[in-house]
Amino acid sequence: MAGTFLFTSESVGEGHPDKICDQVSDAILDACLAEDPHSKVACETAAKTGMIMVFGEITTKAQLDYQKIVRDTIKKIGYDDSAKGFDYKTCNVLVAIEQQSPDIAQGVHEEKDLEDIGAGDQGIMFGYATDETPEGLPLTILLAHKLNMAMADARRDGSLAWLRPDTKTQVTVEYKDDHGRWVPQRIDTVVVSAQHADEITTEDLRAQLKSEIIEKVIPRDMLDENTKYFIQPSGRFVIGGPQGDAGLTGRKIIVDAYGGASSVGGGAFSGKDYSKVDRSAAYAARWVAKSLVAAGLCKRVQVQFSYAIGIAEPLSLHVDTYGTATKSDEEIIDIISKNFDLRPGVLVKELDLARPIYLPTASYGHFTNQEYPWEKPKTLKF
Protein backbone atom coordinates (compact mmCIF):
# COMPACT_ATOMS: atom_id res chain seq x y z
CA MET A 1 0.00 0.00 0.00
CA ALA A 2 1.45 3.37 -1.02
CA GLY A 3 2.40 5.78 1.75
CA THR A 4 2.55 3.12 4.45
CA PHE A 5 5.28 1.49 6.50
CA LEU A 6 5.78 -1.68 8.55
CA PHE A 7 6.56 -1.73 12.27
CA THR A 8 7.11 -4.78 14.49
CA SER A 9 7.04 -5.56 18.22
CA GLU A 10 7.66 -8.79 20.12
CA SER A 11 6.49 -10.20 23.44
CA VAL A 12 7.35 -13.25 25.52
CA GLY A 13 5.29 -15.42 27.85
CA GLU A 14 5.54 -15.96 31.60
CA GLY A 15 7.73 -19.04 31.18
CA HIS A 16 10.41 -17.36 29.08
CA PRO A 17 13.61 -17.66 31.16
CA ASP A 18 14.18 -13.90 31.35
CA LYS A 19 10.56 -13.35 32.35
CA ILE A 20 10.80 -16.02 35.04
CA CYS A 21 13.63 -13.96 36.51
CA ASP A 22 11.66 -10.71 36.29
CA GLN A 23 8.75 -12.34 38.12
CA VAL A 24 10.93 -13.82 40.86
CA SER A 25 12.60 -10.44 41.43
CA ASP A 26 9.23 -8.69 41.67
CA ALA A 27 7.78 -11.42 43.90
CA ILE A 28 10.61 -10.76 46.35
CA LEU A 29 10.02 -7.00 46.10
CA ASP A 30 6.32 -7.50 46.83
CA ALA A 31 7.10 -9.72 49.82
CA CYS A 32 9.30 -6.94 51.22
CA LEU A 33 6.73 -4.19 50.64
CA ALA A 34 3.89 -6.27 52.10
CA GLU A 35 5.58 -6.13 55.51
CA ASP A 36 7.69 -2.98 55.19
CA PRO A 37 6.61 -0.25 52.73
CA HIS A 38 9.96 1.49 53.27
CA SER A 39 11.98 -1.49 52.01
CA LYS A 40 14.92 -0.69 49.77
CA VAL A 41 15.16 -3.45 47.18
CA ALA A 42 17.48 -4.14 44.26
CA CYS A 43 16.95 -7.81 43.53
CA GLU A 44 18.33 -9.63 40.50
CA THR A 45 17.63 -13.22 39.46
CA ALA A 46 19.42 -15.70 37.22
CA ALA A 47 18.02 -19.01 35.98
CA LYS A 48 19.42 -22.09 34.27
CA THR A 49 18.53 -25.78 34.26
CA GLY A 50 17.36 -26.79 37.73
CA MET A 51 18.62 -23.60 39.35
CA ILE A 52 17.41 -20.16 40.42
CA MET A 53 19.80 -17.66 41.96
CA VAL A 54 18.62 -14.43 43.58
CA PHE A 55 21.20 -11.78 44.40
CA GLY A 56 21.38 -8.09 45.14
CA GLU A 57 20.89 -5.59 47.92
CA ILE A 58 17.85 -5.50 50.21
CA THR A 59 17.28 -3.49 53.38
CA THR A 60 13.94 -4.39 54.95
CA LYS A 61 12.23 -5.19 58.23
CA ALA A 62 10.31 -7.98 56.48
CA GLN A 63 11.09 -11.58 57.38
CA LEU A 64 11.54 -13.29 54.02
CA ASP A 65 11.43 -16.99 53.19
CA TYR A 66 13.29 -16.79 49.89
CA GLN A 67 12.87 -20.49 49.17
CA LYS A 68 9.08 -20.28 49.45
CA ILE A 69 8.79 -17.05 47.46
CA VAL A 70 10.87 -18.40 44.59
CA ARG A 71 9.20 -21.81 44.46
CA ASP A 72 5.68 -20.36 44.69
CA THR A 73 6.45 -18.00 41.80
CA ILE A 74 7.75 -20.80 39.58
CA LYS A 75 4.74 -22.96 40.48
CA LYS A 76 2.36 -20.15 39.49
CA ILE A 77 4.16 -19.76 36.16
CA GLY A 78 3.51 -23.44 35.47
CA TYR A 79 6.86 -25.21 35.80
CA ASP A 80 5.71 -28.02 38.06
CA ASP A 81 7.26 -31.10 36.46
CA SER A 82 10.76 -31.97 35.30
CA ALA A 83 9.17 -33.22 32.06
CA LYS A 84 8.47 -29.56 31.28
CA GLY A 85 12.13 -28.75 31.77
CA PHE A 86 11.81 -27.15 35.21
CA ASP A 87 10.17 -28.10 38.50
CA TYR A 88 9.55 -25.72 41.40
CA LYS A 89 9.69 -28.64 43.84
CA THR A 90 13.20 -29.83 43.01
CA CYS A 91 15.12 -26.83 41.63
CA ASN A 92 18.04 -25.42 43.59
CA VAL A 93 17.48 -21.94 45.02
CA LEU A 94 20.64 -19.97 45.75
CA VAL A 95 20.49 -16.67 47.67
CA ALA A 96 23.20 -13.99 47.77
CA ILE A 97 21.50 -10.93 49.26
CA GLU A 98 23.26 -8.14 51.16
CA GLN A 99 22.01 -4.86 52.62
CA GLN A 100 21.92 -1.62 50.66
CA SER A 101 25.24 0.22 50.65
CA PRO A 102 25.32 2.80 53.49
CA ASP A 103 26.95 5.21 51.04
CA ILE A 104 23.85 5.06 48.84
CA ALA A 105 21.49 5.22 51.83
CA GLN A 106 23.01 8.40 53.29
CA GLY A 107 23.01 10.12 49.91
CA VAL A 108 19.48 9.17 48.88
CA HIS A 109 17.05 8.83 51.78
CA GLU A 110 18.55 8.86 55.28
CA GLU A 111 17.40 11.76 57.49
CA LYS A 112 15.22 13.15 54.70
CA ASP A 113 11.49 13.74 54.58
CA LEU A 114 9.70 11.50 52.08
CA GLU A 115 9.09 14.32 49.62
CA ASP A 116 12.77 15.24 49.66
CA ILE A 117 14.34 11.84 49.12
CA GLY A 118 16.74 11.87 46.23
CA ALA A 119 16.78 9.72 43.15
CA GLY A 120 18.35 6.34 43.89
CA ASP A 121 20.72 6.71 40.95
CA GLN A 122 21.39 8.83 37.93
CA GLY A 123 19.66 7.90 34.71
CA ILE A 124 17.36 8.73 31.83
CA MET A 125 13.77 7.52 31.51
CA PHE A 126 11.31 7.65 28.64
CA GLY A 127 7.53 7.55 28.53
CA TYR A 128 5.37 7.11 25.45
CA ALA A 129 1.71 7.19 24.49
CA THR A 130 -0.21 6.99 21.24
CA ASP A 131 -3.88 7.31 20.34
CA GLU A 132 -3.87 4.24 18.06
CA THR A 133 -5.37 1.99 20.78
CA PRO A 134 -7.63 2.70 23.81
CA GLU A 135 -4.74 1.61 26.04
CA GLY A 136 -2.45 4.23 24.54
CA LEU A 137 0.02 1.54 23.47
CA PRO A 138 1.28 0.64 19.99
CA LEU A 139 -1.00 -1.96 18.41
CA THR A 140 2.07 -4.10 17.66
CA ILE A 141 3.08 -4.64 21.28
CA LEU A 142 -0.52 -4.85 22.52
CA LEU A 143 -1.38 -7.70 20.15
CA ALA A 144 1.91 -9.46 20.83
CA HIS A 145 1.12 -9.39 24.57
CA LYS A 146 -2.46 -10.55 24.01
CA LEU A 147 -1.30 -13.56 21.99
CA ASN A 148 0.93 -14.67 24.87
CA MET A 149 -1.87 -14.04 27.38
CA ALA A 150 -4.23 -16.18 25.31
CA MET A 151 -1.74 -19.04 25.20
CA ALA A 152 -1.31 -18.89 28.98
CA ASP A 153 -5.09 -18.93 29.44
CA ALA A 154 -5.48 -21.89 27.07
CA ARG A 155 -2.73 -23.77 28.89
CA ARG A 156 -4.29 -23.14 32.30
CA ASP A 157 -7.90 -23.89 31.37
CA GLY A 158 -6.87 -27.08 29.58
CA SER A 159 -8.22 -26.14 26.15
CA LEU A 160 -4.67 -26.41 24.77
CA ALA A 161 -3.22 -28.63 27.46
CA TRP A 162 -0.12 -29.43 25.39
CA LEU A 163 1.12 -25.85 25.73
CA ARG A 164 4.03 -25.11 28.08
CA PRO A 165 4.86 -21.77 29.73
CA ASP A 166 7.67 -20.61 27.41
CA THR A 167 6.09 -18.73 24.49
CA LYS A 168 7.13 -15.95 22.11
CA THR A 169 5.15 -13.76 19.73
CA GLN A 170 5.87 -11.03 17.21
CA VAL A 171 3.43 -8.84 15.31
CA THR A 172 4.09 -6.62 12.29
CA VAL A 173 1.50 -3.92 11.55
CA GLU A 174 1.23 -1.92 8.36
CA TYR A 175 0.71 1.71 9.34
CA LYS A 176 -0.20 4.92 7.59
CA ASP A 177 1.69 8.02 8.74
CA ASP A 178 -0.91 10.76 9.14
CA HIS A 179 1.26 13.81 9.82
CA GLY A 180 3.11 12.03 12.63
CA ARG A 181 0.15 10.04 13.89
CA TRP A 182 0.38 6.27 13.41
CA VAL A 183 -2.80 4.79 11.93
CA PRO A 184 -2.96 0.95 11.76
CA GLN A 185 -4.12 -0.37 8.38
CA ARG A 186 -3.71 -4.15 8.60
CA ILE A 187 -1.70 -6.96 10.16
CA ASP A 188 1.19 -7.83 7.88
CA THR A 189 2.89 -10.66 9.81
CA VAL A 190 2.26 -12.79 12.89
CA VAL A 191 4.98 -14.94 14.47
CA VAL A 192 4.18 -17.41 17.26
CA SER A 193 6.48 -19.93 18.94
CA ALA A 194 5.35 -22.09 21.84
CA GLN A 195 7.00 -24.69 24.02
CA HIS A 196 4.90 -27.83 23.84
CA ALA A 197 4.44 -31.37 25.09
CA ASP A 198 6.29 -34.04 23.16
CA GLU A 199 3.20 -35.83 21.86
CA ILE A 200 1.65 -33.11 19.67
CA THR A 201 2.67 -32.94 16.02
CA THR A 202 3.92 -29.70 14.52
CA GLU A 203 1.06 -29.81 12.01
CA ASP A 204 -1.61 -30.02 14.73
CA LEU A 205 0.13 -27.40 16.84
CA ARG A 206 0.21 -24.92 13.97
CA ALA A 207 -3.44 -25.47 13.13
CA GLN A 208 -4.58 -25.09 16.74
CA LEU A 209 -2.50 -21.98 17.42
CA LYS A 210 -3.92 -20.33 14.31
CA SER A 211 -7.56 -21.16 15.01
CA GLU A 212 -7.61 -21.01 18.82
CA ILE A 213 -5.14 -18.21 19.51
CA ILE A 214 -4.35 -15.96 16.54
CA GLU A 215 -7.82 -15.80 14.99
CA LYS A 216 -9.45 -15.25 18.40
CA VAL A 217 -7.05 -12.50 19.51
CA ILE A 218 -6.44 -10.44 16.39
CA PRO A 219 -9.42 -8.48 15.03
CA ARG A 220 -10.69 -10.24 11.92
CA ASP A 221 -10.86 -7.04 9.92
CA MET A 222 -7.12 -6.53 10.43
CA LEU A 223 -6.26 -9.87 8.79
CA ASP A 224 -6.38 -10.36 5.03
CA GLU A 225 -5.24 -12.76 2.33
CA ASN A 226 -1.78 -11.19 2.35
CA THR A 227 -1.18 -11.58 6.09
CA LYS A 228 1.80 -13.86 6.65
CA TYR A 229 1.89 -16.43 9.46
CA PHE A 230 5.03 -17.99 10.91
CA ILE A 231 3.72 -20.44 13.48
CA GLN A 232 6.38 -22.54 15.17
CA PRO A 233 8.88 -21.68 12.40
CA SER A 234 11.59 -23.78 14.09
CA GLY A 235 9.34 -26.85 14.10
CA ARG A 236 10.00 -28.63 17.39
CA PHE A 237 10.12 -26.70 20.71
CA VAL A 238 9.92 -29.22 23.57
CA ILE A 239 12.98 -28.04 25.48
CA GLY A 240 12.19 -24.57 26.79
CA GLY A 241 12.35 -22.32 29.81
CA PRO A 242 15.65 -22.22 31.72
CA GLN A 243 16.63 -25.60 30.28
CA GLY A 244 16.64 -24.12 26.78
CA ASP A 245 18.19 -20.75 27.61
CA ALA A 246 19.68 -19.01 30.62
CA GLY A 247 17.53 -16.26 32.10
CA LEU A 248 18.32 -12.92 33.74
CA THR A 249 16.26 -10.14 35.27
CA GLY A 250 16.04 -7.03 33.13
CA ARG A 251 16.75 -8.49 29.70
CA LYS A 252 13.32 -7.80 28.22
CA ILE A 253 13.09 -4.03 28.64
CA ILE A 254 11.57 -3.45 25.19
CA VAL A 255 8.89 -6.08 25.85
CA ASP A 256 8.27 -4.41 29.22
CA ALA A 257 7.75 -0.98 27.67
CA TYR A 258 6.65 0.10 24.19
CA GLY A 259 7.84 -2.60 21.83
CA GLY A 260 10.48 -0.41 20.24
CA ALA A 261 8.15 2.46 19.34
CA SER A 262 9.87 4.68 21.89
CA SER A 263 13.41 5.24 23.05
CA VAL A 264 14.44 3.29 26.14
CA GLY A 265 16.54 4.69 28.98
CA GLY A 266 18.31 1.36 29.52
CA GLY A 267 17.35 0.73 33.14
CA ALA A 268 15.20 -2.30 33.84
CA PHE A 269 12.10 -2.23 36.05
CA SER A 270 11.72 -5.52 37.92
CA GLY A 271 13.18 -6.08 41.37
CA LYS A 272 13.46 -2.35 42.16
CA ASP A 273 11.57 -0.33 44.76
CA TYR A 274 10.17 3.15 44.06
CA SER A 275 13.37 4.96 45.12
CA LYS A 276 14.96 3.57 41.96
CA VAL A 277 13.93 6.11 39.31
CA ASP A 278 14.63 3.52 36.61
CA ARG A 279 11.21 2.25 37.60
CA SER A 280 9.24 5.00 39.36
CA ALA A 281 10.20 7.77 36.95
CA ALA A 282 9.58 5.53 33.93
CA TYR A 283 6.09 4.89 35.29
CA ALA A 284 5.68 8.63 35.83
CA ALA A 285 6.86 9.32 32.29
CA ARG A 286 4.18 6.96 30.98
CA TRP A 287 1.61 8.76 33.19
CA VAL A 288 2.67 12.13 31.80
CA ALA A 289 2.66 10.94 28.18
CA LYS A 290 -0.73 9.28 28.52
CA SER A 291 -2.16 12.38 30.19
CA LEU A 292 -0.94 14.60 27.34
CA VAL A 293 -2.62 12.41 24.72
CA ALA A 294 -5.83 12.09 26.78
CA ALA A 295 -5.97 15.88 27.10
CA GLY A 296 -5.93 16.22 23.30
CA LEU A 297 -2.60 18.04 23.33
CA CYS A 298 -1.10 15.53 20.88
CA LYS A 299 -1.79 12.25 19.10
CA ARG A 300 1.55 10.64 19.92
CA VAL A 301 4.28 11.71 22.32
CA GLN A 302 7.56 10.67 23.90
CA VAL A 303 8.80 12.33 27.08
CA GLN A 304 12.28 12.07 28.60
CA PHE A 305 13.34 12.75 32.20
CA SER A 306 16.81 12.66 33.71
CA TYR A 307 17.93 12.42 37.34
CA ALA A 308 21.11 12.46 39.44
CA ILE A 309 21.69 10.30 42.51
CA GLY A 310 20.65 12.04 45.71
CA ILE A 311 18.87 14.88 43.88
CA ALA A 312 15.07 14.91 44.09
CA GLU A 313 14.12 17.14 41.16
CA PRO A 314 14.63 15.89 37.60
CA LEU A 315 17.52 17.57 35.82
CA SER A 316 15.77 17.84 32.46
CA LEU A 317 12.46 17.35 30.65
CA HIS A 318 12.16 16.77 26.92
CA VAL A 319 9.15 16.06 24.72
CA ASP A 320 8.75 14.93 21.13
CA THR A 321 5.20 15.13 19.78
CA TYR A 322 6.14 14.01 16.26
CA GLY A 323 4.32 16.97 14.73
CA THR A 324 0.96 15.91 16.21
CA ALA A 325 0.62 18.57 18.93
CA THR A 326 -1.80 21.48 19.24
CA LYS A 327 0.82 23.47 21.16
CA SER A 328 4.58 23.98 20.91
CA ASP A 329 6.95 21.60 22.70
CA GLU A 330 7.97 24.50 24.98
CA GLU A 331 4.34 25.06 25.97
CA ILE A 332 3.86 21.34 26.61
CA ILE A 333 6.95 21.20 28.83
CA ASP A 334 5.51 24.14 30.77
CA ILE A 335 2.20 22.26 31.15
CA ILE A 336 4.09 19.20 32.45
CA SER A 337 6.03 21.30 34.95
CA LYS A 338 2.88 22.96 36.29
CA ASN A 339 0.81 19.75 36.54
CA PHE A 340 3.32 17.13 37.74
CA ASP A 341 5.72 17.01 40.70
CA LEU A 342 8.32 14.51 39.51
CA ARG A 343 10.28 14.07 42.73
CA PRO A 344 10.47 10.34 43.66
CA GLY A 345 9.07 10.98 47.15
CA VAL A 346 6.02 12.68 45.64
CA LEU A 347 5.55 10.08 42.91
CA VAL A 348 5.41 7.29 45.49
CA LYS A 349 2.36 8.97 47.04
CA GLU A 350 0.61 10.09 43.86
CA LEU A 351 1.06 6.72 42.13
CA ASP A 352 0.78 4.70 45.37
CA LEU A 353 4.04 2.85 44.71
CA ALA A 354 4.89 1.62 48.24
CA ARG A 355 2.56 -1.38 47.90
CA PRO A 356 3.07 -5.03 46.86
CA ILE A 357 1.71 -4.45 43.34
CA TYR A 358 4.65 -5.35 41.14
CA LEU A 359 4.56 -9.08 40.38
CA PRO A 360 1.77 -8.76 37.77
CA THR A 361 3.72 -6.03 35.94
CA ALA A 362 6.51 -8.51 35.23
CA SER A 363 4.34 -10.29 32.63
CA TYR A 364 2.89 -8.83 29.42
CA GLY A 365 4.28 -5.32 29.84
CA HIS A 366 4.24 -2.73 32.61
CA PHE A 367 1.75 -0.50 30.78
CA THR A 368 -0.82 -3.05 29.61
CA ASN A 369 -2.99 -3.40 32.74
CA GLN A 370 -5.17 -0.30 32.78
CA GLU A 371 -5.94 -0.60 36.51
CA TYR A 372 -2.57 0.76 37.61
CA PRO A 373 -2.46 4.42 38.72
CA TRP A 374 0.08 5.41 36.07
CA GLU A 375 -2.36 4.21 33.40
CA LYS A 376 -5.08 6.61 34.55
CA PRO A 377 -4.56 10.00 32.86
CA LYS A 378 -4.38 13.04 35.08
CA THR A 379 -6.74 15.92 34.31
CA LEU A 380 -4.39 18.69 33.21
CA LYS A 381 -4.82 22.40 33.84
CA PHE A 382 -3.64 24.63 31.01
UniProtKB/Swiss-Prot annotation:
- What cofactor(s) does the depicted protein rely on? Mg(2+); K(+)
Gene Ontology CC annotation, any one: cytosol
Q: Which residues bind Mg(2+)?
A: E10
Answer yes or no on keyword Disulfide bond.
Answer: no
Single Gene Ontology MF annotation: methionine adenosyltransferase activity
What broad class of enzyme is this?
Answer: transferase
Q: State the UniProt keywords alphabetically.
A: ATP-binding, Magnesium, Metal-binding, Nucleotide-binding, One-carbon metabolism, Potassium, Transferase
Asked whether the keyword Cell inner membrane is assigned, the reply is no
Organism domain of life: Eukaryota
**Which residues take part in binding L-methionine?**
E57, Q100, D245, K276
EC nos = 2.5.1.6
**Which reaction is catalysed here?**
L-methionine + ATP + H2O = S-adenosyl-L-methionine + phosphate + diphosphate
Biological process (GO) annotations held by this record are: methionine metabolic process; negative regulation of stress granule assembly; one-carbon metabolic process; S-adenosylmethionine biosynthetic process
Protein's pathway? Amino-acid biosynthesis; S-adenosyl-L-methionine biosynthesis; S-adenosyl-L-methionine from L-methionine: step 1/1
Q: Where does K(+) bind?
A: E44
Family annotation (NCBIfam families) = metK
Q: What else is known?
A: In yeast, there are two genes coding for AdoMet synthase. Present with 103000 molecules/cell in log phase SD medium.
Q: How does it assemble?
A: Heterotetramer.
Q: What job does this protein perform?
A: Catalyzes the formation of S-adenosylmethionine from methionine and ATP. The reaction comprises two steps that are both catalyzed by the same enzyme: formation of S-adenosylmethionine (AdoMet) and triphosphate, and subsequent hydrolysis of the triphosphate.
In the record, the note on similarity to other proteins reads: Belongs to the AdoMet synthase family.
Q: What is this protein called?
A: S-adenosylmethionine synthase 1
Q: Which organism is it from?
A: Saccharomyces cerevisiae (strain ATCC 204508 / S288c)
- Lineage, opening ranks: Eukaryota, Fungi, Dikarya, Ascomycota, Saccharomycotina
- The protein's gene is named SAM1
